[in-house]
Amino acid sequence: GKFNNHTSIFETLLSGFPAGTVSGAPKIRAMEIIDELEKNKRKLYAGGIGYFTPNNEFDTCIALRTALIKNNKFYVQAGAGIVADSKPEKEYLETINKAKALMKAVD
């Protein structure tokens, strides 16, 4: 896409986060609910990872499954897509399975 010449490449990228695919809709209310329900801030999880070139080109992706090692502790974040006909138990198991895959990778 193209962006406004009065907007920096970083402002352009940041305007899209958090991505609707991980926040839900309507976005503002969904983000309020996330803040109410989730014990920890998402930080890297659901954020953008990528690179920028001197020619104002960039390529990014969304961090959907993340692991962080800090102070000898291993933190894992994973999620599932909740929609109107989701079964809570199945979504929970999907999240656990995704997290287990991260833990197995470093085992």
What annotation goes with each model-predicted range?
Residues 1-107:
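Conserved hydrophobic core element of enzyme catalytic domains
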